[in-house]
Amino acid sequence: MSLMDPLANALNHVSNCESVGKNVAYLKPASKLIGRVLNVMQDQGYIGNFEYIEDGKAGVYKVDLIGQINKCGAVKPRFAVKNHDFEKFEKRYLPAKGFGLLIVSTPKGLMTHDEARNAGVGGRLISYIY
């Protein structure tokens, strides 16, 4: 059986591990997109360290959880958002203004919606976390 969306599967696994109180989550298969999303989550303080472990197949990410995540998930379909339209999607995916973040794929790489708004770029919504 193949995975239809590895990013959605990985974020759902992180959310489930957080909710049951685990300290570590193992995400497989690993991909560059999952690694970049984990990097943004680490920069914003939602997860601890993470590392890529080669297993001879697709690889595994070992993620240290620190209890900061209430919910995270992938945005499907990946909506195209202009730099002045982020507020509409904040209302849709985040519980309150200024609480949580949207991760956006922009021409300048993956970043949070606040960074994209400050840089004046739009992109496609990848995931949300709070």
Curated annotation (Swiss-Prot):
Keywords: Ribonucleoprotein, Ribosomal protein, RNA-binding, rRNA-binding. The keyword rRNA-binding applies. It comes from the Archaea. Part of the 30S ribosomal subunit. Belongs to the universal ribosomal protein uS8 family. One of the primary rRNA binding proteins, it binds directly to 16S rRNA central domain where it helps coordinate assembly of the platform of the 30S subunit. This is Small ribosomal subunit protein uS8.
